[in-house]
């Protein structure tokens, strides 16, 4: 059970991709390169854990989750992610996530320390629609025992 809670906390943290900043429009061509930054509150409403191999923590164990992305209490998108345990010694999982907004999606991935409450960065690996060719990073403020939602600050580079 402790493993499941740690993995769920990591999932919510990764999901934690808050308020008052609108989702940016697509950059127009011909303008100088600039950074676009926005924040969302990430919630997890569906989650499933797959315990592979021997019962308990083992390489290849997975967690799959999804949920809405919010700004100012309003849903502005949704997320889906898969985390796979890649190191028992380092308590690491490889997470791959997609964040879907009106007009496009942003993909991201990172190695995450399972159960850690420390903030961390996630690499933006691409996008579609108005986020086509997206690059940059996401600063993650993980969920905690007192705040079940995480905060994601997207830093998109044109």
Model-based region annotation:
Residues 29-158:
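Beta-strand-enriched cores of mature, soluble protein domains
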